[in-house]
From Swiss-Prot:
Organism expressing this protein natively: Gluconobacter oxydans (strain 621H)
Any one GO molecular function term: metal ion binding
Gene3D superfamilies reported for this sequence: Aconitase, domain 3
NCBIfam families: leuC, PRK05478.1, PRK12466.1
Known role: Catalyzes the isomerization between 2-isopropylmalate and 3-isopropylmalate, via the formation of 2-isopropylmaleate.
Protein's recorded name: 3-isopropylmalate dehydratase large subunit
Entry's family note: Belongs to the aconitase/IPM isomerase family. LeuC type 1 subfamily.
Annotated pathway: Amino-acid biosynthesis; L-leucine biosynthesis; L-leucine from 3-methyl-2-oxobutanoate: step 2/4
Length: 475
């Protein structure tokens, strides 16, 4: 499609490169480079193809993974829960019938779809990527336009390799400066959501920029883009750079040799032009961000670890005051109490937000030489089989096992209550996942979102605490 010569954002460039046709109302037929599929949102889509006599248009651009319902315990045993077993069996039947590449449950490469895609080189800069999952935005860390779609759209992409979409607005969130000790990408993202709220990015694609973002490794950038959804955005992006190219090089599905160098030449053009227009701009100072944790039932209910739980009486808006009170009642907290010192029952380190090798290393650095507090259940769930094997090669599994953690198989696990890993009513969990809604990790479970390092600190102390205090002890 023809494009203007005016300065363009990264989002605009990727969008324009993939528009097949622009309709009168502004809706575009958008070509999709990669379609990622999992067991929960695909059964009806494949059945729709079957009923209409259609095939998958680009099986070579489609990849399937089982992750949401899979058990993370003993894989040698059959899946006990009937609905979970049926969904995985249905996925296996569908990918075989329609010729879609699949990472099966017992494959060394199986894992969470948003971990597998980047680590395999399936997701690459400049691509359009969709999946029937809201956290598809994770892949934007590579400089791709990646977003979640519904089941009917899954069928449409399977059949046509296109999707009908209207372009989003542009938003740039810049984080400038150097973060302090103990501050991670998760803390940066929670600070952003604390600033703009869970509706702050509605209707926008967020480009994360600034010196603090450039300093992040790829795992950190994936954490940021993963939770752009919790900021209300359609997707999140980080412009590709040398860090990106070094990460992609040598991945199984990435270009090789001269093709890789040619790809890098194109990828270097994927940056917002000077003077490009952003509908919304937000800037944060990195040095003002400290380790953080959520207190309520929304990701925007976030506090620095030295903060106090808000009081409804301090909120002039009656509706907002009622929301605070409901969250306090659900979470079993008192207005005005310090969030540090809140006891935890469970610690979960995993999910598509924070289950990569770098996340496990950060947690192990806190855990090493310590032990899980009495009465606390702590579990590590690697994001993929490859992450698990790499961690074991470094001896991280031994660090966690010696400390009293459970060392599990790859999967979505306790991020959501769709598999055997879930909270029981009233249990309080320090979790590295992305959502702390009521019942998200199990009926009446209480979730505090935090970084892997903060979760590890909670595991060994039995309470929410400032990880910087533990790091001081080892210096």
């Amino acid at each position: 499609m023809p494009v203007t010569n005016s300065p363009r954002t990264l989002f605009d460039k990727i969008w324009d490169d993939h528009v097949v046709e622009r309709l009168e109302d502004g809706t575009c037929i958008l070509y999709i480079d990669r379609h990622l599929v999992h067991e929960v949102t695909s059964p009806q889509a494949f059945e729709g193809l079957r009923m209409s006599g259609r095939r998958v248009r680009r099986p070579d651009a489609t990849v399937a993974v089982a992750d949401h319902n899979v058990p993370t315990s003993d894989r040698s045993k059959p899946i006990e829960e009937p609905q979970s077993r049926l969904q995985i069996e249905t996925l296996e039947k569908n990918v075989a019938e329609f010729g879609v590449p699949y990472f099966p449950l017992r494959s060394a490469s199986q894992g969470i779809v948003h971990v597998v895609g980047p680590e395999q080189g399936i997701s690459l800069p400049g691509m359009t990527i969709v999946c029937g999952d809201s956290h598809t935005s994770t892949h934007g860390a590579l400089g791709s336009l990646a977003f979640g779609i519904g089941t009917s759209e899954v069928e449409h992409v399977l059949a046509t390799q296109t999707i009908l979409q209207k372009p989003a607005k542009n938003m740039r969130v810049s984080v400038e400066g150097k973060v302090g000790p103990g501050v991670t990408a998760k803390d940066i993202l929670l600070a952003i959501i604390g600033r703009i709220g869970t509706a702050g990015g509605t209707g926008h694609v967020i480009e994360f920029a600034g010196s603090a973002i450039r300093d992040l490794d790829m795992a950190g950038r994936m954490t940021l883009c993963n939770m752009s959804i919790e900021a209300g955005a359609r997707a999140g992006l980080v412009a590709p750079d040398e860090t990106t190219f070094a990460y992609v090089k040598g991945r199984p599905f990435a270009p090789k040799g001269e093709a890789f160098e040619q790809a890098c030449d194109y990828w270097r053009s994927l940056a917002s032009d000077d003077g490009a227009y952003f509908d919304t701009e937000v800037t944060l100072a990195a040095e003002e961000i400290i380790p953080s944790v959520t207190w309520g039932t929304s990701p925007q209910n976030v506090l620095p670890i030295d903060g106090s739980v808000p009081s409804p009486s301090d909120e002039p808006d009656p509706a907002r005051a009622a929301q605070i009170q409901r969250a306090l009642d659900y979470m079993g907290l008192e207005a005005g109490q310090k969030i540090a010192g809140t006891p935890v029952d469970v610690v979960f380190i995993g999910s598509c937000t924070n289950s990569r090798l770098e996340d496990l290393r950060a947690a192990a650095d806190v855990v090493r030489g310590r032990h899980v507090a009495e009465g606390v259940r702590a579990m590590i769930v690697p994001g993929s089989g490859l992450v698990k094997h790499a961690a074991e090669a470094e001896g991280l599994d031994k660090v966690f096992l010696d400390a009293g953690f459970e060392w599990r198989e790859a999967g979505c696990s306790m991020c959501l209550g769709m598999n055997p890993d879930r909270l029981t009513p009233g249990q309080r969990c320090a979790s590295t996942s992305n959502r702390n809604f009521e019942g998200r990790q199990g009926p009446d479970g209480r979730t505090h979102l935090c970084s892997p390092a903060m979760a590890a600190a909670a595991a060994v102390t039995g309470r929410l605490c400032d990880v910087r205090e533990l790091v001081k002890e080892t210096v």
